[in-house]
Amino acid sequence: MVKILLNGCGGKMGTAITNLSNNYDNASISAGVDKFPKSNTGYPVFKSIAEVNVDCDVILDFSRPDSLDEILKYSSQKKLPIVLCTTGYTNEQIDKINEFSKSHTVFRSANMSIGVNIVNNILKSVSSILYENYDIELIEKHHNQKVDSPSGTALLLADTIKNAISEQIDYIYGREGVSKKKHNEIGIHAVRGGSIVGEHDLIFAGEGETIEIKHTAQSRDVFAAGSLKACMYICDKGPGLYDMNDVLGM
Protein backbone atom coordinates (compact mmCIF):
# COMPACT_ATOMS: atom_id res chain seq x y z
CA MET A 1 0.00 0.00 0.00
CA VAL A 2 1.43 3.36 -1.09
CA LYS A 3 0.73 6.01 1.55
CA ILE A 4 0.29 9.46 -0.01
CA LEU A 5 0.70 12.91 1.52
CA LEU A 6 -1.67 15.09 -0.54
CA ASN A 7 -0.65 18.75 -0.60
CA GLY A 8 -3.62 20.87 -1.69
CA CYS A 9 -6.18 18.30 -0.57
CA GLY A 10 -8.98 20.87 -0.26
CA GLY A 11 -8.92 22.02 -3.88
CA LYS A 12 -10.90 20.66 -6.83
CA MET A 13 -8.15 18.23 -7.82
CA GLY A 14 -7.40 17.30 -4.22
CA THR A 15 -11.05 16.39 -3.72
CA ALA A 16 -11.12 14.33 -6.93
CA ILE A 17 -7.96 12.45 -5.91
CA THR A 18 -9.33 11.77 -2.43
CA ASN A 19 -12.59 10.39 -3.81
CA LEU A 20 -10.92 8.25 -6.47
CA SER A 21 -8.32 6.84 -4.07
CA ASN A 22 -11.13 5.14 -2.17
CA ASN A 23 -11.41 2.74 -5.12
CA TYR A 24 -7.75 1.71 -4.91
CA ASP A 25 -6.43 -1.26 -2.94
CA ASN A 26 -2.76 -0.34 -3.43
CA ALA A 27 -2.80 3.41 -2.69
CA SER A 28 -4.38 5.62 -0.04
CA ILE A 29 -4.24 9.20 1.22
CA SER A 30 -2.61 9.05 4.66
CA ALA A 31 -2.52 12.81 5.31
CA GLY A 32 -3.34 16.08 3.62
CA VAL A 33 -2.22 19.69 3.65
CA ASP A 34 -4.52 22.65 3.11
CA LYS A 35 -4.70 26.17 4.52
CA PHE A 36 -8.44 25.72 5.06
CA PRO A 37 -8.81 22.12 6.28
CA LYS A 38 -12.08 20.25 5.79
CA SER A 39 -13.31 17.85 8.44
CA ASN A 40 -14.72 15.12 6.21
CA THR A 41 -11.64 13.93 4.33
CA GLY A 42 -11.18 10.66 6.20
CA TYR A 43 -7.53 11.46 6.97
CA PRO A 44 -5.71 14.07 9.09
CA VAL A 45 -5.25 17.47 7.42
CA PHE A 46 -2.56 19.97 8.42
CA LYS A 47 -2.36 23.68 7.63
CA SER A 48 1.27 23.44 6.48
CA ILE A 49 3.43 20.59 5.26
CA ALA A 50 5.95 21.32 8.02
CA GLU A 51 3.32 20.27 10.59
CA VAL A 52 2.72 16.81 9.10
CA ASN A 53 3.63 14.05 11.56
CA VAL A 54 2.13 11.07 9.73
CA ASP A 55 4.28 8.44 8.00
CA CYS A 56 3.94 8.63 4.21
CA ASP A 57 5.70 7.16 1.18
CA VAL A 58 5.31 9.98 -1.35
CA ILE A 59 4.26 13.63 -1.59
CA LEU A 60 1.60 14.45 -4.20
CA ASP A 61 1.32 18.19 -4.84
CA PHE A 62 -1.69 19.86 -6.42
CA SER A 63 -1.41 23.28 -4.82
CA ARG A 64 0.23 26.54 -5.91
CA PRO A 65 3.73 27.44 -7.13
CA ASP A 66 4.50 29.42 -3.97
CA SER A 67 4.41 26.16 -1.98
CA LEU A 68 7.45 24.76 -3.79
CA ASP A 69 10.18 25.69 -1.31
CA GLU A 70 8.49 24.15 1.71
CA ILE A 71 7.68 20.99 -0.29
CA LEU A 72 11.30 20.56 -1.35
CA LYS A 73 12.45 21.17 2.21
CA TYR A 74 10.06 18.58 3.65
CA SER A 75 10.96 16.08 0.93
CA SER A 76 14.65 16.47 1.72
CA GLN A 77 14.10 16.13 5.47
CA LYS A 78 11.88 13.04 5.22
CA LYS A 79 13.61 11.55 2.15
CA LEU A 80 10.30 11.29 0.30
CA PRO A 81 9.81 11.29 -3.48
CA ILE A 82 7.64 14.08 -4.87
CA VAL A 83 4.97 14.10 -7.57
CA LEU A 84 4.59 17.73 -8.70
CA CYS A 85 1.36 18.39 -10.61
CA THR A 86 1.13 22.12 -9.93
CA THR A 87 1.50 24.43 -12.94
CA GLY A 88 2.52 28.07 -13.27
CA TYR A 89 6.11 27.71 -12.04
CA THR A 90 8.57 30.47 -12.94
CA ASN A 91 11.73 29.62 -14.89
CA GLU A 92 13.68 30.06 -11.66
CA GLN A 93 11.46 27.53 -9.89
CA ILE A 94 11.81 25.06 -12.75
CA ASP A 95 15.60 25.39 -12.51
CA LYS A 96 15.32 24.73 -8.77
CA ILE A 97 13.25 21.58 -9.40
CA ASN A 98 15.74 20.33 -11.98
CA GLU A 99 18.65 20.89 -9.61
CA PHE A 100 16.80 19.21 -6.73
CA SER A 101 16.13 16.14 -8.88
CA LYS A 102 19.85 15.49 -9.25
CA SER A 103 19.90 14.21 -5.67
CA HIS A 104 16.21 13.47 -5.02
CA THR A 105 13.37 11.57 -6.69
CA VAL A 106 11.04 13.98 -8.47
CA PHE A 107 8.13 13.48 -10.86
CA ARG A 108 6.84 16.55 -12.70
CA SER A 109 4.21 16.86 -15.38
CA ALA A 110 2.06 19.72 -16.63
CA ASN A 111 -0.80 17.30 -17.27
CA MET A 112 -1.55 13.95 -15.64
CA SER A 113 -4.01 12.73 -18.28
CA ILE A 114 -2.94 9.68 -20.28
CA GLY A 115 -4.75 11.13 -23.31
CA VAL A 116 -2.90 14.46 -23.23
CA ASN A 117 0.43 12.68 -23.03
CA ILE A 118 -0.49 10.52 -26.03
CA VAL A 119 -1.41 13.70 -27.93
CA ASN A 120 1.94 15.17 -26.92
CA ASN A 121 3.76 12.18 -28.39
CA ILE A 122 1.73 12.43 -31.60
CA LEU A 123 2.87 16.05 -31.91
CA LYS A 124 6.50 14.96 -31.63
CA SER A 125 5.99 12.82 -34.73
CA VAL A 126 3.90 15.08 -36.97
CA SER A 127 4.84 18.69 -36.18
CA SER A 128 7.98 18.89 -38.30
CA ILE A 129 6.13 17.31 -41.24
CA LEU A 130 3.12 19.62 -41.05
CA TYR A 131 5.00 22.84 -40.32
CA GLU A 132 6.16 23.43 -43.90
CA ASN A 133 2.64 23.83 -45.31
CA TYR A 134 0.44 24.54 -42.30
CA ASP A 135 -0.03 27.45 -39.90
CA ILE A 136 -0.22 26.42 -36.25
CA GLU A 137 -2.56 27.79 -33.59
CA LEU A 138 -3.46 26.46 -30.14
CA ILE A 139 -6.65 27.15 -28.19
CA GLU A 140 -7.05 26.07 -24.57
CA LYS A 141 -10.18 26.35 -22.42
CA HIS A 142 -10.54 26.03 -18.65
CA HIS A 143 -12.91 26.91 -15.81
CA ASN A 144 -13.10 30.44 -14.47
CA GLN A 145 -11.17 29.63 -11.28
CA LYS A 146 -7.93 28.65 -13.02
CA VAL A 147 -5.27 31.19 -12.08
CA ASP A 148 -2.48 30.59 -14.63
CA SER A 149 -2.76 31.46 -18.30
CA PRO A 150 -1.90 30.00 -20.70
CA SER A 151 -2.24 26.60 -19.07
CA GLY A 152 0.78 24.48 -18.29
CA THR A 153 -0.55 21.90 -20.73
CA ALA A 154 -0.80 24.48 -23.52
CA LEU A 155 2.83 25.42 -22.97
CA LEU A 156 3.82 21.74 -22.84
CA LEU A 157 2.18 21.07 -26.20
CA ALA A 158 3.52 24.27 -27.77
CA ASP A 159 7.05 23.48 -26.58
CA THR A 160 6.78 19.99 -28.07
CA ILE A 161 5.86 21.48 -31.45
CA LYS A 162 8.60 24.10 -31.17
CA ASN A 163 11.26 21.53 -30.30
CA ALA A 164 10.29 19.37 -33.28
CA ILE A 165 10.84 22.21 -35.77
CA SER A 166 14.31 23.26 -36.86
CA GLU A 167 13.42 26.95 -37.39
CA GLN A 168 13.07 29.67 -34.74
CA ILE A 169 9.48 29.60 -33.47
CA ASP A 170 7.81 32.53 -31.69
CA TYR A 171 4.77 32.35 -29.41
CA ILE A 172 2.00 34.93 -29.79
CA TYR A 173 -0.32 35.07 -26.79
CA GLY A 174 -3.68 36.16 -28.16
CA ARG A 175 -3.96 38.46 -31.16
CA GLU A 176 -4.75 42.14 -31.48
CA GLY A 177 -3.85 45.04 -33.73
CA VAL A 178 -3.29 45.03 -37.47
CA SER A 179 -0.73 42.55 -38.76
CA LYS A 180 -0.57 39.36 -40.78
CA LYS A 181 0.37 36.06 -39.19
CA LYS A 182 3.99 35.08 -39.69
CA HIS A 183 4.54 31.44 -40.54
CA ASN A 184 6.99 30.89 -37.69
CA GLU A 185 4.42 32.01 -35.10
CA ILE A 186 2.35 29.72 -32.91
CA GLY A 187 -0.70 31.57 -31.62
CA ILE A 188 -1.68 30.49 -28.10
CA HIS A 189 -5.15 31.52 -26.97
CA ALA A 190 -6.72 31.03 -23.52
CA VAL A 191 -10.44 30.89 -22.73
CA ARG A 192 -11.71 30.98 -19.14
CA GLY A 193 -15.32 30.36 -18.22
CA GLY A 194 -17.83 28.31 -16.28
CA SER A 195 -16.80 24.84 -15.17
CA ILE A 196 -14.80 23.70 -18.21
CA VAL A 197 -12.48 20.95 -16.96
CA GLY A 198 -9.95 21.33 -19.77
CA GLU A 199 -9.81 21.45 -23.57
CA HIS A 200 -6.77 21.76 -25.83
CA ASP A 201 -7.20 22.16 -29.58
CA LEU A 202 -4.14 22.09 -31.86
CA ILE A 203 -4.98 23.60 -35.25
CA PHE A 204 -2.82 22.98 -38.33
CA ALA A 205 -4.37 25.20 -41.03
CA GLY A 206 -3.23 24.67 -44.62
CA GLU A 207 -4.45 25.66 -48.08
CA GLY A 208 -7.76 23.88 -48.62
CA GLU A 209 -7.70 21.77 -45.47
CA THR A 210 -7.35 22.00 -41.72
CA ILE A 211 -6.12 19.32 -39.33
CA GLU A 212 -7.16 19.48 -35.69
CA ILE A 213 -5.76 17.40 -32.85
CA LYS A 214 -7.97 17.87 -29.81
CA HIS A 215 -8.16 16.60 -26.26
CA THR A 216 -11.15 17.20 -24.00
CA ALA A 217 -11.16 16.25 -20.33
CA GLN A 218 -14.73 15.49 -19.29
CA SER A 219 -13.89 14.77 -15.66
CA ARG A 220 -11.10 15.56 -13.22
CA ASP A 221 -10.91 11.83 -12.56
CA VAL A 222 -8.62 11.44 -15.59
CA PHE A 223 -6.04 13.66 -13.88
CA ALA A 224 -6.62 12.02 -10.50
CA ALA A 225 -6.04 8.54 -11.96
CA GLY A 226 -2.80 9.65 -13.61
CA SER A 227 -1.63 11.24 -10.36
CA LEU A 228 -2.21 8.08 -8.34
CA LYS A 229 -0.51 6.05 -11.05
CA ALA A 230 2.53 8.36 -10.86
CA CYS A 231 2.68 8.01 -7.06
CA MET A 232 2.74 4.23 -7.30
CA TYR A 233 5.34 4.34 -10.07
CA ILE A 234 7.84 6.66 -8.41
CA CYS A 235 7.98 5.17 -4.90
CA ASP A 236 10.81 2.75 -5.63
CA LYS A 237 12.74 4.92 -8.08
CA GLY A 238 16.12 6.53 -7.45
CA PRO A 239 17.05 10.21 -7.80
CA GLY A 240 16.09 11.80 -11.09
CA LEU A 241 13.40 13.76 -12.89
CA TYR A 242 10.52 11.62 -14.16
CA ASP A 243 7.38 12.40 -16.16
CA MET A 244 4.31 10.68 -17.62
CA ASN A 245 6.32 9.20 -20.47
CA ASP A 246 8.19 7.15 -17.87
CA VAL A 247 4.96 6.07 -16.18
CA LEU A 248 3.36 5.07 -19.48
CA GLY A 249 6.52 3.50 -20.90
CA MET A 250 6.47 5.80 -23.93
Curated annotation (Swiss-Prot):
Pathway: Amino-acid biosynthesis; L-lysine biosynthesis via DAP pathway; (S)-tetrahydrodipicolinate from L-aspartate: step 4/4. It is an enzyme of class 1 (oxidoreductase). NADP(+) binds at K35. The active site is at H142 (proton donor/acceptor), K146 (proton donor). (S)-2,3,4,5-tetrahydrodipicolinate binds at H143, G152, T153. Keywords: Amino-acid biosynthesis, Cytoplasm, Diaminopimelate biosynthesis, Lysine biosynthesis, NAD, NADP, Oxidoreductase. GO terms for biological process: diaminopimelate biosynthetic process; lysine biosynthetic process via diaminopimelate. It catalyses: (S)-2,3,4,5-tetrahydrodipicolinate + NAD(+) + H2O = (2S,4S)-4-hydroxy-2,3,4,5-tetrahydrodipicolinate + NADH + H(+); (S)-2,3,4,5-tetrahydrodipicolinate + NADP(+) + H2O = (2S,4S)-4-hydroxy-2,3,4,5-tetrahydrodipicolinate + NADPH + H(+). Pfam families: DapB_C (PF05173), DapB_N (PF01113). It comes from the Bacteria. NAD(+) binds at G8, C9, G10, G11, K12, M13, D34, C85, T86, T87, S109, A110, N111, M112. It is found in: Cytoplasm. SUPFAM superfamilies: Glyceraldehyde-3-phosphate dehydrogenase-like, C-terminal domain (SSF55347), NAD(P)-binding Rossmann-fold domains (SSF51735). GO terms for cellular component: cytosol. GO terms for molecular function: 4-hydroxy-tetrahydrodipicolinate reductase; NAD binding; NADP binding; oxidoreductase activity, acting on CH or CH2 groups, NAD or NADP as acceptor. Its EC number is 1.17.1.8. Catalyzes the conversion of 4-hydroxy-tetrahydrodipicolinate (HTPA) to tetrahydrodipicolinate. HAMAP family: DapB. Belongs to the DapB family. This is 4-hydroxy-tetrahydrodipicolinate reductase. It comes from Clostridium acetobutylicum (strain ATCC 824 / DSM 792 / JCM 1419 / IAM 19013 / LMG 5710 / NBRC 13948 / NRRL B-527 / VKM B-1787 / 2291 / W).
